[in-house]
């Protein structure tokens, strides 16, 4: 269901940026599960460029049982742009959940006006995809913008409205990146480093997908995937607790 989204993202990335492959830890790039009614495959890709230090995207194909496309784009540490977050999930062809956002690193007014306010036009363009659903695992005020698209919808809407919104959000993000001024002050850069690490930690501690990964691919593999690839700057809770 979400293969056209993956293909569009990939085409955009290769056309716009001088990409280099980024190493995915052994055993995490691809895996097949024989659990459940439909075998599931998970495949991930990871790249970097001068402007973007980590571009990761993952596709889970479990046939009619599940189709999942997830991606996060991390700007280089000398840019204070939000992260681009994409999470599209379908279960049994009837439950379709889409999340698309510029995920802010900071909440101060200047930052919000600079990077989040420009999203308002697109948010208003897709009111049917901005459903103000409850976030069960996250604080909506942390690492999410007030103009995120967050909706439960049907397969036809995914292929039309959601795909159109996806293209619009990507185009605005690329434009913001092109217009961004690189930071050179070491203190500014360290602030970005910390903010992106904090994002990884926050996300790894709360990501509800870890249970899904475990159900398909086993707990040990899921933990590695979460902490060595998806959110590699996060410290596993057991490790952080032992250091106290």
Curated annotation (Swiss-Prot):
Annotated Pfam families: Fe_bilin_red
Enzyme Commission code(s) on record: 1.3.7.2
One BP term from GO: phytochromobilin biosynthetic process
Gene3D superfamilies, alphabetized: 3.40.1500.20
Keywords on record: Oxidoreductase
GO MF, one example: 15,16-dihydrobiliverdin:ferredoxin oxidoreductase activity
Reaction(s) catalysed (UniProt annotation): 15,16-dihydrobiliverdin + oxidized 2[4Fe-4S]-[ferredoxin] = biliverdin IXalpha + reduced 2[4Fe-4S]-[ferredoxin] + 2 H(+)
Disulfide bonds: none
Family designation: Belongs to the HY2 family.
NCBIfam families cross-referenced by the UniProt entry: PRK13247.1
Job description of the protein: Catalyzes the two-electron reduction of biliverdin IX-alpha at the C15 methine bridge.
Protein name: 15,16-dihydrobiliverdin:ferredoxin oxidoreductase
Originating gene: pebA
């Amino acid at each position: 269901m979400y293969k056209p989204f993956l293909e569009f993202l990939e085409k955009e990335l290769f056309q716009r940026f001088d990409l280099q492959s980024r190493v995915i830890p052994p055993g995490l790039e691809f895996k097949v599960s024989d659990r459940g009614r439909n075998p599931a495959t998970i495949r991930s890709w990871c790249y970097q460029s001068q402007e973007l230090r980590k571009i990761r995207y993952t596709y889970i194909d479990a046939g009619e049982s599940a189709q999942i496309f997830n991606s996060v784009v991390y700007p280089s540490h000398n840019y204070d742009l939000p992260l681009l977050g994409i999470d599209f999930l379908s279960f049994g062809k009837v439950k379709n959940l889409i999340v698309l956002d510029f995920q802010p690193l900071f909440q101060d007014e200047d930052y919000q006006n600079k990077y989040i306010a420009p999203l308002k036009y697109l948010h208003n363009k897709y009111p049917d995809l901005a459903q103000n659903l409850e976030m069960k695992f996250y604080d909506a005020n942390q690492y999410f913008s007030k103009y995120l698209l967050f909706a439960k919808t049907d397969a036809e809407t995914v292929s039309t409205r959601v795909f159109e919104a996806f293209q619009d959000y990507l185009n605005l993000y690329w434009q913001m990146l092109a217009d961004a001024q690189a930071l050179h002050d070491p203190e500014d850069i360290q602030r970005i480093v910390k903010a992106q690490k904090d994002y990884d930690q926050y996300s790894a501690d709360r990501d509800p997908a870890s249970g899904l990964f475990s159900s398909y691919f086993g707990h040990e593999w899921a933990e590695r995937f979460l902490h060595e690839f998806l959110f590699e700057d996060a410290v596993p809770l057991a490790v952080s607790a032992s250091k106290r």
